[in-house]
């Protein structure tokens, strides 16, 4: 039983370490979230990949990205300038 708990804990830790960061794409020109009001999921996916993320989609009205590298800049509520 202890072995099973240890295995599950290790798998969860691996997911956290390997999964990368996720969040809203930062529009560096104004410090806000990158809007996809007139865009699409494929447009957001391309934008996210251009900013070193693995993939992204339009979480209307802003682009949401998965798999950012550790040095990637993303939008944060605490540093929100909008």
From Swiss-Prot:
One of its GO terms (molecular function) is toxin activity. Its main location: secreted. Disulfide bonds join 32-82, 36-58, 44-63, 48-65. It is found in: Secreted. Residues 1-20 form the signal peptide. The keyword Secreted applies. InterPro entries: LCN-type_CS_alpha_beta_dom (IPR044062), Scorpion_toxin-like_sf (IPR036574), Scorpion_toxinL (IPR018218), Scorpion_toxinL/defensin (IPR002061). Keywords: Disulfide bond, Ion channel impairing toxin, Neurotoxin, Secreted, Signal, Toxin, Voltage-gated sodium channel impairing toxin. SUPFAM superfamilies: Scorpion toxin-like. One of its GO terms (cellular component) is extracellular region. Beta toxins bind voltage-independently at site-4 of sodium channels (Nav) and shift the voltage of activation toward more negative potentials thereby affecting sodium channel activation and promoting spontaneous and repetitive firing. Is toxic to arthropods. Has the structural arrangement of an alpha-helix connected to antiparallel beta-sheets by disulfide bonds (CS-alpha/beta). Belongs to the long (4 C-C) scorpion toxin superfamily. Sodium channel inhibitor family. Beta subfamily. This is Toxin TdNa6. It comes from Tityus discrepans.
